[in-house]
């Protein structure tokens, strides 16, 4: 049917009503989605394919062709005006000549790599990770610094070219990059080196703060430590650590954490049909893994993480924003996620201690990392007793979850 002209293709769905046609499309889509999900449990070789460009007619997992055709490598051309219909001169694969790091000893073509089907990726990887490559180590060190201090040494982590911002401390960036390479590209050593430095361990206050704000308002000179707000992932993981729910297991398949119920049940289109509703992982041990392992649906972001500036997965984010908006406060006070974490924290403190005073102390230790002061202790104990009496008179409503949902699709 694919090979026939449109006017000669036989009609589809003969004898089916529009309702039956819609159900058939949804069922086919479900079959495709669940096949993809089941494939995640199959062993997979982390390898690359060298050969002519294979023809793929679907979005399922690519497999090695049984018979690799003996055809030439696809030619890459300069597109005149950016148009696919106007190919210009053919070009060969190569590396950035501006960095001055050659890939071959041929003086005529020092920056080109092989044009054969095998060896191109390896040649590029060796060039990127070459100790004399001036870009790779600096880019890595710049991002690690940004992770610890909230802002990078060079202002555009995604752009180390002439249009990017110049580093505020170029000699420091060069020294860290050189030391990183000389010591075997050890990330653990780099993190330790930064975190044990006097700059990292500075106080957030300065005796001449007003003078510094006039001379260096953005603290480019690093005269004092600027506090960094937790990222969305760190915030969620930190709450799970405090409540004792965090599953610290390393590796494995992505998990489906709990998200807002209304968002989870919203109809979502995928490949011209309805996608299955979002379903959290069955067991708490699965749901409460680190956010690093959370499965991200591009068309259905987690509203809590999105509210706290988790980047859009469709974009390349070089530096996160740290906006403070009113819905963040409401979410931290009234969201289902926070209510569940508060309940889990209370249950943990009751399990560890029977005495109310020790329970209050334990909660503050877990959340703030310190013991309560005298006035805090009294206020918190009085508040807990007040809430206990209130809840004895007013039982909380039982939470009920839908066991089935109905979603309709309108053909236009």
Which residues does each predicted region cover?
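Active-site Gly/Thr loop motif
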Residues: 290, 300-308
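Glycine-rich phosphate-binding loop at the start of an alpha helix
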Residues: 323
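Primarily short, surface-exposed interaction patches in extracytoplasmic proteins
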Residues: 1-286, 311, 315-320, 333, ...
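Active-site-proximal helix/loop microenvironment
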Residues: 291, 332
